[in-house]
């Protein structure tokens, strides 16, 4: 295949909220440009993971190169990079945008603009991309394009009166959209003769090929067989295979400035080609690496432990392979008295945490226990030291703590006026402080400062149910703020269970302690002795319940006769139970750890 001239290349991605029809539109592009034969077409071609198809969401960014014949008679090479729409995967979006010159802003003509779309769209505009508004689902009876166009102009602030109206499901106006895309989005710039600079947008591990990297060539030309250098590690490799996806893998001889494609260089070390790094030639190397992406900080932390301790090594390898493919995942070894050895993992949000756990269990056949998720707190000790704690069991003694500061997030919410009351009530319940309230044409834009610990756990789900699915949310960490927080310990038979400890606000501690002990009472199986379940703040017990003992009928064999005989047997049983209570261990089932998560949801 001959190398196409740079002026006929267009690199673009699609910005859209979940369920606004982004993956369906991508399918139509592939069909229209003949990327796959009719037999190979299936719905959501680019959502390659089973989880993506089951949940109907896009998690990983994918890339496709399509050839499109325009009305002007020229063939254009369209490099389309698919992006996820959920707030937890926003870092994937910023990586995709770094490889593009333009973006399609796809908005559902019935639902209107959502908060997450606004945030991503601003990222695209900041990176200097041309944003092209598109109205999708125009075939729906409840579609109201005029209202949505007004909303795009009011909320995002870009011209939208000539937005293209398409129906991706029916394939209506998709060709017209591609025609306009070719005109509106500029071709890439970059000198093909300059020293090579290629930005790694994504990487994944293939058992046969090693690390496969998705790259965008910014300058220079990468040819098959070239000796290339990874700029951050300084290691050299040979480019064994290069090519692009159509969406099938198609080998090429070279990738020149402006192109998007994959490189296989026999890198067997999982961290050999980190995402956001720059590839260059080993001999004529570029002077400086390209600016990468901003490093994402994990917001939610949880302990992940294998149920079988023999699975620790496979679990560690699985995490390393997954981290290559998911740059936002963070992990470090951790041990727990209750659960043994495992890892403390950092995630971007609860959905990210669920997806990671599900991928580990499915793709690597592991059985895992997850502890209650927490956020990272800033602790100022009485000695004036500053500590960051993301694990309740690492919290210093209460006497040594000067001040605990919790992370505060700024949450932007868009909601129809009908549900405003319910959403405000929810924000107040979550200890939110209102900063801004703005009435737009058909929506209300609200800005709240809410503690991050309240946002990440179940705020998104509660917001959706309070607004019947119409509200949308975008949040970001803002600052740390002093708060009256305490560590809530759970004791079972007088023993602290480190995996069940949580950090809560003092006002909520009593309620939370009572709910937790009640829930655990139902989940811990009855033993031959009474089991006390207590919630404590420091040395003060604030709630208690008991799991009553199972009792064998020891007097069943006595028929009539002397009462002292029965009494003797009962006393003997009582003494045995007392001894058992001192030495007996209680096995805590997996459900008990999950109870900590579910207490908040009810």
From Swiss-Prot:
One of its GO terms (biological process) is positive regulation of translation. The gene is lepA. The keyword Ubl conjugation does not apply. CDD domains: EF4_II, EF4_III, LepA, lepA_C. Required for accurate and efficient protein synthesis under certain stress conditions. May act as a fidelity factor of the translation reaction, by catalyzing a one-codon backward translocation of tRNAs on improperly translocated ribosomes. Back-translocation proceeds from a post-translocation (POST) complex to a pre-translocation (PRE) complex, thus giving elongation factor G a second chance to translocate the tRNAs correctly. Binds to ribosomes in a GTP-dependent manner. Coiled coil: none annotated. This is Elongation factor 4. It is an enzyme of class 3 (hydrolase). GO terms for cellular component: plasma membrane. GTP binds at residues 19-24, 136-139. Pfam families: EFG_C (PF00679), GTP_EFTU (PF00009), GTP_EFTU_D2 (PF03144), LepA_C (PF06421). InterPro entries: EF-4, EFG_III/V, EFG_V-like, EFTu-like_2, G_TR_CS, LepA_C_sf, LepA_CTD, LepA_IV. One of its GO terms (molecular function) is GTPase activity. HAMAP family: LepA. Its EC number is 3.6.5.n1. SUPFAM superfamilies: EF-G C-terminal domain-like, P-loop containing nucleoside triphosphate hydrolases. It catalyses: GTP + H2O = GDP + phosphate + H(+). Residues 7-189 form the tr-type G domain. Belongs to the TRAFAC class translation factor GTPase superfamily. Classic translation factor GTPase family. LepA subfamily. It is a peripheral membrane protein.
């Amino acid at each position: 295949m001959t190398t196409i001239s740079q002026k006929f290349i267009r690199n673009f991605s699609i910005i859209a909220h979940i369920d606004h029809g982004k993956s369906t539109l991508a399918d139509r592009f592939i069909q229209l440009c003949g990327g796959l034969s009719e037999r190979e077409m299936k719905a959501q071609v680019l959502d390659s993971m089973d989880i993506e198809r089951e949940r109907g969401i896009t998690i990983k960014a994918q890339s496709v190169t399509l050839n499109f014949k325009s009305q002007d008679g020229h063939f254009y090479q369209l490099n389309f990079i698919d992006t996820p729409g959920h707030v937890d995967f926003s870092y994937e979006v910023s990586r995709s945008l770094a490889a593009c010159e333009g973006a399609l802003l796809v908005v559902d003509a019935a639902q209107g603009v959502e908060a997450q779309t606004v945030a991503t769209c601003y990222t695209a505009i900041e990176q200097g991309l041309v944003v092209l508004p598109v109205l999708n689902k125009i075939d729906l009876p409840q579609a109201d394009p005029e209202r949505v166009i007004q909303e795009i102009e009011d909320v995002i602030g870009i011209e939208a009166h000539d937005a293209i109206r398409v129906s991706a499901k029916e394939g209506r106006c998709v060709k017209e959209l591609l025609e306009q895309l070719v005109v509106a989005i500029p071709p890439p710039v970059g000198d093909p003769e300059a020293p090579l600079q290629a930005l790694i947008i994504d990487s994944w591990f293939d058992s046969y090929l090693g690390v496969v990297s998705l790259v965008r060539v910014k300058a220079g030309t990468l040819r098959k067989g070239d000796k290339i250098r990874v700029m951050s590690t300084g290691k050299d490799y040979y480019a064994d295979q290069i090519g692009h996806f159509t969406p099938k893998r198609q080998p090429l001889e070279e990738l020149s400035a402006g192109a998007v494609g994959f490189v296989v260089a026999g890198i067997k070390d999982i961290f050999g080609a980190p995402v956001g790094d720059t590839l260059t030639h080993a001999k004529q190397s570029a002077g400086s690496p390209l600016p990468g992406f901003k490093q994402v900080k994990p917001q939610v932390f949880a302990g992940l432990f294998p149920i079988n301790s023999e699975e620790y090594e496979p679990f560690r390898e699985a995490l390393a392979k997954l981290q290559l493919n998911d740059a936002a995942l963070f992990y470090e070894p951790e041990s727990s008295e209750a659960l043994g050895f495992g890892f403390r993992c950092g995630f971007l949000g609860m959905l990210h945490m669920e997806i990671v756990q599900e991928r580990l269990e499915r793709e690597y056949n592991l059985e895992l226990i997850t502890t209650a998720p927490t956020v990272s707190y800033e602790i100022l000790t009485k000695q004036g030291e500053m500590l960051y704690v993301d694990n309740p069991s690492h919290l210093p003694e209460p006497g040594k703590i000067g001040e605990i500061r919790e992370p505060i997030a700024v949450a932007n919410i868009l909601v129809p006026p009908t549900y405003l009351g319910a959403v405000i009530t929810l924000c107040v319940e979550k200890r939110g402080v209102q900063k801004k309230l703005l009435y737009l044409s058909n929506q209300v834009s609200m800005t709240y400062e809410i503690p991050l610990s309240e946002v990440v756990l179940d705020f998104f789900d509660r917001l959706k149910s309070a607004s019947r699915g119409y509200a949308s949310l975008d949040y970001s960490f803002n600052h740390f703020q002093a708060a009256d927080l305490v560590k809530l310990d759970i004791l079972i038979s007088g023993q602290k269970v480190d995996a069940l400890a949580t950090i809560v606000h003092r006002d909520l501690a009593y309620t939370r302690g009572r709910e937790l002990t009640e829930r655990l009472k139902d989940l811990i199986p009855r033993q031959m002795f009474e089991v006390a379940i207590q919630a404590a703040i420091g040395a003060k017990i604030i709630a208690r319940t008991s799991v009553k003992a199972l009792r064998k009928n020891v007097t069943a064999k006595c028929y009539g006769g002397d009462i002292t005989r029965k009494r003797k047997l009962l006393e003997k049983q009582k003494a045995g139970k007392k001894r058992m209570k001192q030495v007996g261990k209680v096995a805590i089932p997996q459900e008990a750890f999950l109870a900590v998560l579910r207490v908040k949801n009810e």
